[in-house]
Amino acid sequence: MAIEREDQDLNEQFHASKEYGADQIQILEGLEAVRKRPGMYIGSTSTRGLHHLVYEIVDNSVDEALAGFCDNITVTIHKDNSITVEDDGRGIPVDLQKKAGKSALEVVFTVLHAGGKFGGSGYKVSGGLHGVGASVVNALSTYLDVTVCKDGKIYTMSFSKGKVTKEIECIGTCTEEEHGTKVHFLPDAEIFEESIYDFDTLKVRLRETAFLTKNLRIKLVDEREEELREMTFHYEGGIKEFVRYLNKGKEALYPDVIYCEGEKEQILVEVAMQHNDSYTENIYTFVNNINTPEGGTHLTGFKNALTKTFNDYARLNKLLKDSEPNLSGEDIREGLTCIISVKIEDPQFEGQTKQKLGTSEAQVAVQGIVSEQLTYFLEQNPAVARVMCEKSIMAQRARAAARKARDLTRRKSALDGVGLPGKLADCSSKDAERCEIFIVEGDSALGPAKEGRNPETQAVLPLRGKVLNVQKARLDRIYANEEIKGMITAFGTGINEDFDLSKLRYHKIIIMTDADVDGAHISTLMLTFIYNFMPDLIKEGHVYLAQPPLFNITKNKKHYYAYSDEEYQNILKEIGAEGADVSRFKGLGEMDTEELAETTMDPETRTLLRVNMEEDDKAELDITFTTLMGDQVEPRREFIEKNARYVKNLDV
């Protein structure tokens, strides 16, 4: 059913010249600033920056794969948290780079913006950070050793903190069939706040890279435990398999993934898509394997093609009556999972980050290829076209009903203060940066929360009914749910296309539920809603989870609060169990006003957990929320079994 073109020369147009020598390496500037301002080059010195070092080296190997010269990449985490990345590409050039007067290998690892990615014939398309990778990793590592197999010889070179410690040396021979690069490095603990690599973080990124690079095999090895841990990612179906993976836990509306591939305007385009029974669209866009979370011209081209092609087909085949309006793009994309991947020789991005593609030719290329091939697909698969049309029409009706409900909500809150939920105990301050709102479950916690708060800056909104599971609901049901409607109105931002962060009434939104399984379920329902309809609240750091204590230990008229069984045991050891009076809180309602204020609400003494998300995490987060809140039981059971060891609160 998938549309595939047997065009053997298509990828070859994007493969680089086999000439990959010193003269393909171009030098733009020096390396001095990296150790002084590492955040400028890798984003941060947190755990995120630590993992970014691995991606930089891996991306260089992936560039070899995109150029058609690499089939295998192995990433190894060693016991000391050093990393080895090994590939079977052509091997970094080792001959003299004329302009620098030193070996190309040394240039690659000691000069910023050096690489075969700047107009030479070394690479046609490239991800990474335009050649920044290897030198930045070197600058931020205690040591870095590189081994190159090339032209029948084995070369090594060593560095420390960006400086050469051992000159390039030929240490032996290899067969002509052996070729590639091996980089072994240890991140500098003086630079990074965290020095421990997380297997799962690397796994997610490497799996995504393998999906986007058809037939590339990436192996991840962890040597830190007694039992070696290994995972291999290899997808012959490429982004088609990516879509199937993302739709795991959802019910696909038709069996096969729709696939479009072609080349136009010297741009290689791949699109894979499939509708499922959910009500949200999940579209992920990539340029040269780099995620573009803000979309850009390639996304615009796809949306234009999908909307026009589908409406044209529906009209021609009488799936839409003449009297009915066209289906909107949003209606057609409801429940759509889609990957858009383009390969461009010199992509232009908007702004300083690679978040949004600006290359105008990409819109023309994607729109043309998707229009032509999707038209052919719909004509060949009328049953699938009908299923897509029926879902889109249902979405259109639900959107119309939601619009009426939304307009009603807007009218109610048109005047400042008017239309706020009646159950909201608001704060008196109008300075949003100072204000926070506690979302509490039930009336039992409402009394102590209202009495224990600071009424100037702390608001309280109780949830009296069951929060809707938005993972299984259309917009019209969402606007009809009183609890969700109350949150939308109280927060002030609106949702979806109406969302406006500048109208946020409280800079801290604190979910305060009981420290038990039911409380965790309510928190998850609320996070599912915020993630799907107000994700910027999470991205900008406005959403928190309150951390109420589990135990109150009293001895000699002094109170000690424990937030876990482990902390409880430690406190008893410290103060002595004899004469200690211990009470376990079953819920927020069991605390008196002073206890709740001191342990959970007072900014001076409470503990909050900030909810974080990064754009790069979106695909995995979508899968997690679908697993936890979707219809299918088996993926949820597997998730619980896998993560049971992390559970802190267990009702027995």
What do these predicted regions represent?
Residues D63-E64, G91-I92, V517-D518:
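Residues immediately C-terminal
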Residues Q97-K102, I154-Y155, F159-S160, M601:
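Conserved P-loop NTPase nucleotide-binding/switch module
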